Amino acid sequence: MKKVRSFVSGLLFLLIGVVIVVFVLNLFVKQQPQPKPQSEKVEEKQAIHLVAIGDSLTKGVGDSQRNGGYVSRIRSKLTTLDTVKNVTTENFGVPGERSDEILDRIKTDSEIKKEVTAADMVILTAGGNDIVQTIKKEKLSVSEKSFDHALEAYRENLKEMLQQISVYNPKAHIYVYGLYNPYAAYFPDLKEMQTLLIEWNTSTETIIKHQPLATFLPIDIIFNGTDRLNNQSTTTDADDAETVVENPYLYEEDLFHPNDAGYEKMAEVLFQAIQKNE
């Protein structure tokens, strides 16, 4: 009987000891400084390399600062984003070039290939000189039919441009500006030109819809839509008292290329598209 009591007493003492040890350990653990939960990782800022290829709109003809038109302006806009570390740009704009000439440079210019390969995004302007040179060639005999061949050639050239850029860099997003009618404010009765521009822009947009990582940038709505109507001014010719409407987004020297305000609008359209896609 004494042995049983001794065994029970020893077991009870052991259990009490275990409880005390567990209590002390638990108290010690609670007193230790708990690691603070990790705060959300700050998103790493991105360095952006933008390559612009095209005609006089890419070169920036009409920009009073002679600083690359929409290219310098989109660089400034992108650097305001919290997620962007820095922005570098390359401008391969050549005034007067048709779409076939731009395509040839994309395919053969080693500098363009190098920059496109390293680009995060590529911006294109093309097609305007295809129309202008067709008008110059046909002169007084020009008609809607005159542009059929030029439009078909433009379509094929644009497809090849997109394909070649994608070969150089399949991850780069391509943005393609549409065309605008510079004559709408000054020759509102010239409906054929607006019809022609709509057809070309529709063709461009259709091609881009079938191209991965490509976005169409419509700008005719800026140069000739309600935005222009709300900001345009008028002047009166002293000789014949004729009222002339002035487009606030066109360069006064030629009334064809964008001015500073026009390039700012082009950059804004591109900026909004980039924010949506990137």
Residue spans for each PLM region:
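Hydrophobic membrane-insertion alpha-helices, especially the h-region
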Residues: 9-26
